[in-house]
Amino acid sequence: NKKTFLNINSSIKKVEKKIGFKISNNQKTIEYSPLALEYLKNISKKISDKKGALLIIDYGYLEDSMKDTLMAIKKHTISNLFKEFKNSDITYKLNFKLLKKITNILKLKCQGITTQRNFLLNLGIQQRAEIISRNLPFSRKADIYYRLKRLIDKNQMGELFKVMLITDKRINFNLGF
């Protein structure tokens, strides 16, 4: 019962037809989730029908060119994908620029894309931490600030995670962006 990974070669034309726009010929890697694209199409209908929104917070990147980001995570650490795949979370980083292009094709509006750090700082997370920790013992304050640092530090989740707000075209909302 040996498990293997398959590298499925697909025609760029097929991928372009699925995502709805032409991909640069200079791309060495095309990484996207067809299932995620289907989910986004279904969600977009609900967003349009209900004048709703979708807030995405995930690790990803903002560059135009696609990257090979497939990885395995075990106990909060990147592990060897081929040796640890049974005991790891297999994941990849979202290409937020690709997601924005798809959002436009689906006739939705991207209200903003930013880092988790900027989003939380713009929403006043530091002031909130000060308020809730004001009368707490030192150990509880330290815990709050330790967790805050993890969320907004550039070397931790602050820059790795991105935040994107997708809404119906009739909505204007930029809080946090």
Where are these regions (language model features)?
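Short phosphate-coordinating micro-motif centered on Lys-Gly-acidic
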Residues: 1-11, 17-19
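Long, Lys/Arg- and hydrophobic-enriched amphipathic alpha-helices
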Residues: 15-177
